[in-house]
């Protein structure tokens, strides 16, 4: 197939249209516009950078003039139309796309990342039991850890934090709400504040590849 040459202004217009930055209200207004925007973009990266406002709020506000922070909270924690997981970074993802991330979740069952090399299975079981017994929690709710020295600047002295993170990447728990960067973790079941999904859907390789091919050009 012969490459198609386009001018820089044309390429710019194509990109702006794909990103829905060339129309005033591409996703409508009100709380429902937030999951619609995330659905079109495929995901919205969650960023700790905070000069004027956090990056994910900027991304939504530039496409939804009436956007408010509580709209994202509503989508994640009340209506459960989006969930958090890792794309190239931590991101908000449409809940209907969760099945396409199951392969990544299962990979953490087969391969132990160097980030979690020191996490023991019994530590993961302990935090899971705690969530099942007491409901959703944040790392601040865990006050009986034996503190350890940090192995890098962003680490926690609580071993339970790394265990919670591994459970998250395995798809055993989800982030049911956020307060800034403080995450509330819960089971996937709706009774404990999760997404409402009782178990992970089955993974299928071919539909996942097809989805990647469809989703990537739409917003990039």
Where are the model-predicted features located?
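Long, low-complexity intrinsically disordered regions
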Residues: 1-220
């Amino acid at each position: 197939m012969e490459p198609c040459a386009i001018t820089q202004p044309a390429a710019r217009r194509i990109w702006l249209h794909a990103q829905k930055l060339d129309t005033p209200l591409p996703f409508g207004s009100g709380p429902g516009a937030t999951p619609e925007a995330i659905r079109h973009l495929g995901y919205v990266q969650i960023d700790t950078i905070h000069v004027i406002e956090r990056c994910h709020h900027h991304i939504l506000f530039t496409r939804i003039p009436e956007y408010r922070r509580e709209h994202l909270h509503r989508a994640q924690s009340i209506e459960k139309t989006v969930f958090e997981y890792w794309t190239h970074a931590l991101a908000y993802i449409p809940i209907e796309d969760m099945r396409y991330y199951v392969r990544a979740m299962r990979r953490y069952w087969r391969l132990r990342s160097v980030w979690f090399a020191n996490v023991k299975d019994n530590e993961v079981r302990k935090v899971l039991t705690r969530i099942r017994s007491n409901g959703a929690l944040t790392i601040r709710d865990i006050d009986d850890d034996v503190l350890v020295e940090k192995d890098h600047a962003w680490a926690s002295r609580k071993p339970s934090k790394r265990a919670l993170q591994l459970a998250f990447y395995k798809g055993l728990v989800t982030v049911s709400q956020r307060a800034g960067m403080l995450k509330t973790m819960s089971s996937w079941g709706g009774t404990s504040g999760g997404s409402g999904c009782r178990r992970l859907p089955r993974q299928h390789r071919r539909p996942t590849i097809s989805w990647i091919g469809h989703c990537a050009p739409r917003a990039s």
